[in-house]
Amino acid sequence: MILTVTMNPSIDISYPLEELKIDTVNRVSEVSKTAGGKGLNVTRVLAEIGDNVAATGLIGGTNGEFLLQNLNQAVRPLFYNISGDTRNCIAILHESKQTEILEAGPTITVDEANGFLHHFKSLMESAEVVSISGSLPAGLPVEYYIQLVEIANQAGNKVVLDCSGAALEAVLKSDVKPTAIKPNNEELSQLLGREVSKDLDELKAVLSEPLFDGIEWIIVSLGADGAFAKHWETFYKVDIPKIQVVNPVGSGDSTVAGISSALSHQADDVSLLKKANVLGMLNAQEKMTGHVNVENYDDLYNQITVKEV
């Protein structure tokens, strides 16, 4: 089983408007509400490709109940309830623009933080791969992901960690290492305090720095240029075909789903990289975030090339 972790989920609300009028009433005829958060995007994609997946994280209030009701029926809900209400994230789509209003979300108490650690530990026996995605809610220390990764490692589970900023830096500087991370160029630049380009020789040098020691897989998305990856001491360049991009949001989460799935199936290097990239591309071809059309899987998969560099 693959266990996904979303510590700060949301209800994503979309308001399409022809024009956003300031300081007056705006009426919306169509409203879209979906269970949101990076980890839940991963969860949806894993369910759509037929993997055995369960979802955990923190939920609360009426929004938490809505989130549970809107999970794919193939997903086992193993969430931990908190006193605060799961947040709303509002996107106003207007005049080919997108204005977002994001709630900070609930503040987690010490008892809730400790309670989730015990809950998480109880799930390790039935998991093989743990996929941790997104930001930490208020109240949790920046080192919280270190504790989750350590619990999973002690249980012998593989861990895919997709976060950024201080939370990622804390894990990388600790003695506890995830199996795989998926930083982009911007996140690499932030971690190292200098600009990192898409040049392959530079990426090879960057991923060989001591900060990344002990991590089995590092996969860097290069957008339309594919991806660059390091598996232990072997480097790969992934080339992808050109596609019609409809909505790129969630493609990184779909890539994480591919990494997690491939690890759970003990795939070889080339198969892992192709699966990760094809799912990211399939998401980009869909209007809905965290969704793939599996009918197009084989066609795109066969057009992806992976070479050792």
UniProtKB/Swiss-Prot annotation:
Organismal lineage: Bacteria, Bacillati, Bacillota, Bacilli, Lactobacillales
SUPFAM superfamilies linked: Ribokinase-like
Family: Belongs to the carbohydrate kinase PfkB family. LacC subfamily.
Annotated organism of origin: Streptococcus sanguinis (strain SK36)
Chemical reaction(s) catalysed: D-tagatofuranose 6-phosphate + ATP = D-tagatofuranose 1,6-bisphosphate + ADP + H(+)
EC numbers for this chain: 2.7.1.144
Protein name: Tagatose-6-phosphate kinase
Domain of life: Bacteria
Gene3D superfamilies: 3.40.1190.20
Stretches that traverse the bilayer: none
Keyword field contains Kinase: yes
GO cellular component, one term: cytosol
Keywords (A to Z) from UniProt: ATP-binding, Kinase, Lactose metabolism, Nucleotide-binding, Transferase
